[in-house]
């Protein structure tokens, strides 16, 4: 999703809309297990479930989806939240089963009820995309807020996107910036890139190419190839810095090597073939 470039130059990219993949994201983190005060029976049950999930994860990573599904169902039946998350992702992406977003929602809700913030974020994505239920940006925002309040940085970024693009709420760049900064403060490099775009575009703030470069560099240092491309755009266009074609090529090459198609096209337009 790109923005029109200044001075008729090359466009730059705001990056993907979501921090998680369209496939609902991967299992992030692990929910709390049995508390220390749990009874011996409860502790043994939790340990058994964890062992099952570990075996299921091995099967999942090896591509043995049918075996993983059986194991995760057993672990979820005795209350393991990680297993519920895996099941939600499997139903949402069609691994080992036909795609069933309603079933994915059921499992994510169970995990969310147990306090799993990634499940809350994934429920928000289902509402945002209208998968298994009518599309609702408002419901998506509600779930992203729940996840963000539990510390989920992907949800923080998603809230920022909704305010930036006016999805279910009026456009509010200041609020978008606030949420992007929260996510970036927790190490989210996609949010750092998004902040750079706001400064480069002058959305809710004065145009500040130096600040834009600072945020792009933060994101690029974390491996964000969209930010690498955006740095190349600044160098090529001489935006806030002395125009330097060689530096632009350096950054386009870094981004292209990481798979950025915009950077690959930029190199071609500059006559660079390697």
Q: Which sequence ranges carry the predicted segments?
A:
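N-terminal secretory signal peptides that target proteins for export/translocation
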Residues: 1-12
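Alpha-helical segment of the N-proximal tetratricopeptide repeat
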Residues: 48-74, 78
């Amino acid at each position: 999703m790109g923005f029109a470039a200044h001075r008729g130059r090359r466009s730059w990219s705001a990056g993907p809309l979501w921090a998680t993949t369209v496939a609902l994201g991967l299992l992030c983190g692990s929910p709390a297990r049995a508390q220390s005060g749990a009874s011996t029976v409860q502790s043994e049950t939790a340990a058994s479930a964890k062992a099952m999930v570990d075996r299921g994860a091995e099967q999942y990573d090896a591509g043995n989806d049918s075996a993983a599904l059986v194991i995760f169902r057993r672990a979820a039946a005795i209350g393991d939240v990680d297993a519920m998350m895996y099941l939600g992702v499997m139903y949402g992406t069609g691994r080992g089963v036909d795609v069933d977003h309603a079933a994915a929602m059921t499992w994510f809700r169970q995990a969310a009820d147990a306090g799993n913030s990634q499940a809350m974020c994934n429920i928000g994505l289902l509402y945002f995309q209208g998968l298994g239920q009518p599309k609702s940006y408002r419901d998506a925002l509600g779930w992203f807020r729940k996840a963000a309040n539990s510390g989920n940085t992907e949800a923080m970024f998603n809230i920022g996107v909704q305010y930036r693009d006016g999805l279910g709420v009026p456009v509010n760049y200041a609020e978008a910036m606030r949420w992007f900064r929260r996510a970036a403060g927790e190490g989210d490099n996609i949010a750092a890139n998004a902040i750079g775009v706001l400064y480069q575009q002058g959305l809710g703030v004065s145009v500040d190419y130096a600040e834009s470069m600072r945020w792009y560099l933060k994101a690029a240092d974390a491996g964000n190839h969209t930010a690498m491309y955006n740095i190349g755009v600044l160098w090529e266009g001489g935006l806030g810095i002395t125009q330097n074609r060689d530096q632009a090529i350096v950054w386009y090459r870094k981004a292209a090597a990481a798979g950025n198609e915009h950077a690959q096209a930029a190199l071609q337009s500059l006559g660079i073939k390697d």
